[in-house]
Amino acid sequence: MRQIIDYDCNFKEEVGEVLKDISTSQNTLGFNVISILGCQSTGKSTLLNALFDTHFKVLDKLTSGYCQTTKGLWLGCGTESFNSPILIWDVEGTDSLERGEDRATFENRAALFSLAVSDCMILNIPLMNLTTYSSSNFGLLKTILNSWFSLKLDQNGITRGNIRKTTLLFAVRDITINDNDEMLGRKVVQILDLLWRQVAESQNSLGNQIPASFSDIFEVKVYGIPSLPNDYDGFKQVVAAIRYDLTTSILPKDYTRRIPLEGLEMYCKTVWKCIVDCQELNIPSQIKLVSRFRCEQAKDDILDGYKKSIKDLQKKMEKREFGFNEFSDCTLLVLENSLAAYFEVASKYDHEMSTNSSISLLVFIFHEFQNAVNSRMSLERQDLRQYTNILDYYKKGIEDHQVQYDKENNEESHYVSFDSSSWVNKELLKFDSLSLKWKTEFPSVISRQHLISPIKEKCIPDILNEISLSSQGKEVFLATYNTQEQRKLLSETLEIHSKKIYEKLVEEFFESLIKDILKEISPLLGDHFLSDPKLKLDDFWELTGSSIVNIHRLLVSKYEQQWITLFKNSNMNEFTSSGLEEEIALQLVLKFIQLIQQQSKYFHINIVDRFKNEFELDQDGVPRQWIGEDAKTMKELFIKAKNNSLQITNVFYPRKDQLIPLSGRFSNLFDKIIENSEDLSGIIALNKGHGNGKFLDSVPLISESNLKEIESKASQEITSIFSKAQLIQSTGRQPQNIPWWIYLLIIILGFDEITYVLTSPVLVTLLLLLASFIYSYLTGNFSSFCNYSQQFVIISTKILHYISGAIHSSLDNRK
């Protein structure tokens, strides 16, 4: 026996200590709860001990007299002659002198608590008080009837017959031989009818729905019990009859509040707390509250037990140790065992609460399964994204097509193209097909508990992809998992690869195009310009324009089909916005401009060559002999050849129509050339800044400063050539040849080394001084060092002057 609620209304958490005496499983509804109410010192505890073989403390008149024995609420367990455990609440007696005027508060709380937790309430009433109001506790009974409405027990279906009604067992004590149960029953019912009419009137004014009679909400049993001291045998006989009726008809098979034995302590605690805190005591809500708590607790216990199994599954998936069948078998086993363990506990609680918690359990488990599948699909995604041979595949398709095209030259051609969308979708289809093979079979308990629809609502599409019914051999539900996160990553990777493939193909296309352009335009400057000194600039630009047009037509014909094939399914708008013809025209002119600009670095050589061809050769191409030539004629010839050769620098300042022979076909071609050539745009901007430039009406390909530098270099060499011609004309002979010993010295030491030393007289002198110092140091004759040093300086100066003059003279002659 344990005191659960003490004298000061504090709930002591010792219900579990009482339940330890029960040998049956704690997860059961197969028990009943009985409470007893009545006035103090009327034998309540004695009756309980006789009925249930309990050991509640009873009144000892000899030692303590008539006083309060039971304080608060005590709980005991009785199993004697009962098929299932009986939990008995021995409630402190009412109308006690010890509590005084505050007794009503505790009495009402105790009565309401007893009504909330009991299958059967025993009302212990002495026969002599049956016709009184206060002593018979009928005032308290009226409170109980009123409290029934606040408990909202009708929401559990009591008035509809779905759940057994609470039994009010009236134990009328100390009856005589003239009193019988029938007479006592009529009296009790008469009193109850009177009380019910009063309660119904007050509840009707509050708007509550009133049952027709108290019998709609309570079962009433009345037993007359003889006095134990006066009629021991009669007392025992009636007690045995009550016990028999309790076992066979009064007590239900299961606890009417649908709370398993293990959840009873929490239920009683929350009920008492609501009563003490003066909160609304809604019994269905309290039942749901306890059910929710215990079901969530059971769910957490299940998850704690299966976390290791789930983690092992995830590790095996990450290590590729599980195939499709192993994954399906393992997940089915986890679901079967976890749900079986869960419903073993939760099935005893409120169905709605147990279902909700089971859905929460399944959502967590499916989410962990999804993580395992995503981990595995991450590895598969990394395998699928290795596309190093895609570009080779594309090229091979082009080559195969070319072979087929050669065989069917007269038939309509079918060109292979790289379709980005088709390729990406094809690879994603492989991923989806693989993802759908990771399936989980639902155990039969999911169907029995009608959980398919809630699972679909909670898990699709975030966790599960779909739930399908398979009819192969047996009807089972199969779930596949949402792998959109990995699919999205793969799609992004594919898009990047696709773009890289196009970029590579475009790069190779333009590399091939530029290579052919350079190959075709390179001879233009040599053939038309360098080899023919008589060619005029207008003729040069006419021939060059004609060649560029022909090259353009040739390249368009060559690359047209490749262009169409490459960009047919491309989203690269920066390339497809302009047509092939305009693109080739743009690249042709740009590369030709670059070629001319590159020639500018050595263009003074071209000017000198043209000068030589005109100045040193006659009309028949025979070298001129300047000996005896008239000086005036030589000068006129020199001026003419020089002016003619320097005029070719105008090639760097052509007109727009000369530079762009295709401008008539492409109106905005010049603007694109300026846009794509930073050097050209900078030169144009620079020349516009010089208002006195002589080529403002032309397209400048080089700056004026570079042009002046070219003319200066060419003029120097032209002047040197003319000077040598004058020397020959005046002396009648060629410049002196190089001495033999100079050649020998060049062979032994090297021309570059000798030139470097000779162009540095100070270095030669320092070397000679160093040699004389070393000699003097070794011999100890430092006076000779000073003499030798002076002589070396004088001799080296003379020798260097002579050798330098000879070499420069010979080199000038070779030029």
Curated annotation (Swiss-Prot):
GO terms for biological process: endoplasmic reticulum membrane fusion. GO terms for cellular component: endoplasmic reticulum membrane. It is an enzyme of class 3 (hydrolase). It is found in: Endoplasmic reticulum membrane. One of its GO terms (molecular function) is GTPase activity. Residues 759-761 are lumenal. Its EC number is 3.6.5.-. It is a multi-pass membrane protein. Keywords: Coiled coil, Endoplasmic reticulum, GTP-binding, Hydrolase, Membrane, Nucleotide-binding, Transmembrane, Transmembrane helix. Residues 28-260 form the GB1/RHD3-type G domain. InterPro entries: G_GB1_RHD3_dom, P-loop_NTPase, RHD3/Sey1, Sey1/RHD3-like_3HB. The chain crosses the membrane at residues 738-758, 762-782. GTP binds at G38, C39, Q40, S41, T42, G43, K44, S45. Residues 1-737, 783-815 are cytoplasmic. Belongs to the TRAFAC class dynamin-like GTPase superfamily. GB1/RHD3 GTPase family. RHD3 subfamily. Probable GTP-binding protein that may be involved in cell development. HAMAP family: Sey1. This is Protein SEY1 homolog.
